[in-house]
């Protein structure tokens, strides 16, 4: 079996002894990009997978902590069973990928297994395009070594030690030379006569050599793919060079001052393939469909990721993750209704709901609102603007929340399920109203007498007592 000397670090990692038969074995050291932040979802997954029993004082605490870490990763309060299943399938799919592909796919942060497959298919098409070729220059041809004796006692002759040129496929012409930078401990077979006796060139049988050269070219193709991945701008591994020492341990060619070889480096990756995914709205192009899907949300205003705590919606899952942390931090500012806030300004905005303070007034009808966003949404009633349209039936809405609720009529989706009684709802506001039955929460209170209510409609009925419009319920 011929030894491959080109590729990424994972490809050139420790191998079985029978495969390490050449005098030119090299070890490539990965250069990790330090200080680069992992995606939030990946960070939570790693915390869950890497949690150790020794991190807790006892088994009960360990189990409790595992539950917390699992919920932070899978987020069952916002994900359906199908979405959680998809996360687990995606994790296992990335696990079974070759390490060089696994690192490349993870850099693109796919949100589903289907998206990961699309990325890999795009990469395959890119590799099949013309121009993705490589050749070894005539003056830099490397010998191909073959192990011909399992006992390690093969005879040697002067003629057998002459290097044979490595014939690469014409498919790889145009990239120029590829070098591998050696690091760590080298395996210097040439300096030990006993090791040299175990290896010699496969020139005894010309027909056998031709067949093996063909298989070496095929093997080189596989390793070239690894080099392509290593050279991608998005990959975490930096470019790597090859530096081969000669038998006497002289200075490597790449490190010779002023030498032509020393000035050569890994060639820049060829221009990537055409960006096939084009936005119909603005004409911007993308290399994969997932990025186009995310970009289109800037035009449609779609926000499919909804916080179950407050109902706020986001266009990207990463933004929802960042927002969700605001519900987990300390909230020193408490309202009489039981809600707490991390900032005093948020408490003041909330209290306007109780005091009915409304500093934002519509110039057309005089109606006032407690928040600026509410005024903007209300103003669309006068302008008739309905920027959110349903793709199924064409119906338009002035608010994204209205579109989201409407679309669930087509899908039948009811993502908000009560853990107490199992009842499901298609909108977070309906779920929150129902949940107060179980918790006894009464967030609406009368500023005249301090009485609290679980719904705003009940508060309105009660306030008629103070205004003289009717009896208290």
From Swiss-Prot:
Composition bias type Basic and acidic residues, residue spans: 258-272
InterPro entries associated with the record: SCAN_dom, SCAN_sf, Znf_C2H2_sf, Znf_C2H2_type
Record location of the Glycyl lysine isopeptide (Lys-Gly) (interchain with G-Cter in SUMO2) cross-link: 27, 221, 232, 349
SUPFAM superfamilies in alphabetical order: beta-beta-alpha zinc fingers, Retrovirus capsid dimerization domain-like
A matching Pfam family: zf-H2C2_2
UniProt KW keywords: Activator, Differentiation, DNA-binding, Isopeptide bond, Meiosis, Metal-binding, Nucleus, Repeat, Spermatogenesis, Transcription, Transcription regulation, Ubl conjugation, Zinc, Zinc-finger
Location(s), subcellular: Nucleus
Domain SCAN box: 45-127
Record flagged with keyword ATP-binding: no
PROSITE patterns from the UniProt entry: SCAN_BOX (PS50804), ZINC_FINGER_C2H2_1 (PS00028), ZINC_FINGER_C2H2_2 (PS50157)
Region (Disordered): 127-169, 244-272
One GO molecular-function entry: RNA polymerase II cis-regulatory region sequence-specific DNA binding
GO cellular component: nucleus
Keyword Ubl conjugation: yes
Family: Belongs to the krueppel C2H2-type zinc-finger protein family.
Name of this protein: Zinc finger and SCAN domain-containing protein 21
Originating species: Homo sapiens (Human)
């Amino acid at each position: 079996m011929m030894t491959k000397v080109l590729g990424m670090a994972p490809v050139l990692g420790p191998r079985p002894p029978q495969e390490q038969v050449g005098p030119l074995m090299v070890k490539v050291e990965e250069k990790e990009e330090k200080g680069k932040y992992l995606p939030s979802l990946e960070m939570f997954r790693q915390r869950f997978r890497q949690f150790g029993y020794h991190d807790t004082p006892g088994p009960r605490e360990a189990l409790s902590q595992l539950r917390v870490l699992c919920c932070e990763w899978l987020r069952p309060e916002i994900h359906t069973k199908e979405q959680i299943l998809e996360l687990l399938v995606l994790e296992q799919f990335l696990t079974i990928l070759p390490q060089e592909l696994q690192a490349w796919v993870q850099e693109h942060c796919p949100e589903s297994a289907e998206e990961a497959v699309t990325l890999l298919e795009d990469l395959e098409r890119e590799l099949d395009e013309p121009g993705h070729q490589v050749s070894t220059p005539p003056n830099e041809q490397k010998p191909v070594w073959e192990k011909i004796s399992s006992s390690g006692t093969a005879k040697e002759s002067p003629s057998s030690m002459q290097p044979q040129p490595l014939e690469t496929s014409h498919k790889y012409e145009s990239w120029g030379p590829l070098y591998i930078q050696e690091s760590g401990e080298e395996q210097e077979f040439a300096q030990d006569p006993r090791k040299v006796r175990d290896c010699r060139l496969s020139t005894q049988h010309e027909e056998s050599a031709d067949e093996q050269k063909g298989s070496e070219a095929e093997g080189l193709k596989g390793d070239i793919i690894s080099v392509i991945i290593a050279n991608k701008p998005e990959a975490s591994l930096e470019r790597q060079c090859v530096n081969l020492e000669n038998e006497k341990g002289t200075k490597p060619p790449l490190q010779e001052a002023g030498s032509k070889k020393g000035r050569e480096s890994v060639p820049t990756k060829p221009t990537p393939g055409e960006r096939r995914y084009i936005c119909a709205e603005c004409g911007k192009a993308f290399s994969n469909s997932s990025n186009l899907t995310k970009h289109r949300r800037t035009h449609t205003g779609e926000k499919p990721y909804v916080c179950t705590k407050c109902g706020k919606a986001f266009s990207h899952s990463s933004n929802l993750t960042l927002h969700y942390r605001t519900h987990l931090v300390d909230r020193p500012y408490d309202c009489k209704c039981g809600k707490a806030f991390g900032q005093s300004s948020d408490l003041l905005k909330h209290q306007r709901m109780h005091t009915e303070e409304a500093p934002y007034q519509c110039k057309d009808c005089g109606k006032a609102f407690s928040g600026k966003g509410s005024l903007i949404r209300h103003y669309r009633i006068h302008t008739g603007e309905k920027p959110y349209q349903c793709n199924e039936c064409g119906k338009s809405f002035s608010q994204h929340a209205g579109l989201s609720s409407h679309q669930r009529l087509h899908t039948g989706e009811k993502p908000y399920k009560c853990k107490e009684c199992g009842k499901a709802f298609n909108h977070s506001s309906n779920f929150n109203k129902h949940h107060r039955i179980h918790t006894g929460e009464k967030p609406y209170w009368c500023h005249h007498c301090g009485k609290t209510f679980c719904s705003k409609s009940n508060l309105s009925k009660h306030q008629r007592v103070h205004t003289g419009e009717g009896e208290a319920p």
